[in-house]
A protein has these predicted regions:
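Conserved AMP-binding/adenylate-forming
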Residues: 2-50, 57, 179
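Conserved S/T- and glycine-rich ATP-binding loop of Class I adenylate-forming
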Residues: 16, 33, 64, 133, ...
Length: 216
């Protein structure tokens, strides 16, 4: 996936935006972006169009990724409009078996990584540093629109190491059923399990009836 990002023109310090629930593609792109020193930004599937439009316009991602549907909401028209109105996005990728123009499927996106040779890939990875931003989290302020907060690779890892000192368990497994566009899902969930060498259990939505079975 990191090679596919490079093939699509994503460089060091540039952003990608992903409208997603907790699912494997989130983990893949989040890690791939960090690998080459790019920045991952999550978009909340429950956000209104105007909220999504503001964040995409403010963060200026090079690629827009999106699920096709969640809880009865079809995102096809909304993300196509986001893409057409964006001044920065050069590619729209739908995480679905099929994608209609102007989008391509996630599989097509990944296939593009074959264009990047080993030397180019290794050079891009070598540029990544602990101080590089890895994640943008939009958080409400006391006035005006939400503000984008930059979290560095090193800062995220150090936070997770400290959490592991206090919240250790064997085996180390974390259920992620919260939005991944914020700290709880992306850092305290996804990254902490990776840092600990543990396992992420992804649930697209919180379901009280299903939780006991998942825990067992």
């Amino acid at each position: 996936a990191a090679r596919a990002l490079l093939a699509a023109g994503v460089g060091h310090g540039e952003r990608i935006a992903q409208l997603t629930t907790p699912r494997p593609e989130f983990m893949v792109l989040y890690a791939a972006a960090a690998r080459i020193g790019a920045i991952w930004l999550g978009l909340n599937p429950r956000a209104r169009y105007d909220e999504l439009g503001y964040i995409v316009g403010d963060s200026r991602p090079r690629i827009l990724f999106s699920i096709a549907e969640f809880e009865g909401r079809d995102y096809g028209d909304d993300v196509s409009r986001l893409f057409s109105e964006s001044e920065s996005a050069e590619q729209l990728v739908m995480m679905a078996p099929e994608a209609r123009t102007p989008a391509i499927s996630f599989e097509e996106f990944l296939a593009g990584g074959a264009k990047i040779d080993a030397a180019t890939y290794e050079k891009a990875c070598a540029r990544a540093r602990p101080g590089d931003a890895a994640l943008i989290v939009y958080t409400s302020g006391s006035t005006g629109q939400p503000k984008g907060a930059l979290l560095s690779q090193g800062g995220i890892v150090r936070t997770c190491l400290e959490q592991c000192r206090h919240w250790w368990a064997e085996p180390f497994r974390i259920i992620i059923n919260v939005p991944v566009n914020h700290i709880g899902g992306a850092v305290q969930g996804a990254t902490q399990a990776l840092v600990a060498g543990g396992t992420n259990v992804l649930m697209e939505r919180f379901d009280p009836a299903a939780i006991p079975g998942v825990i067992e």
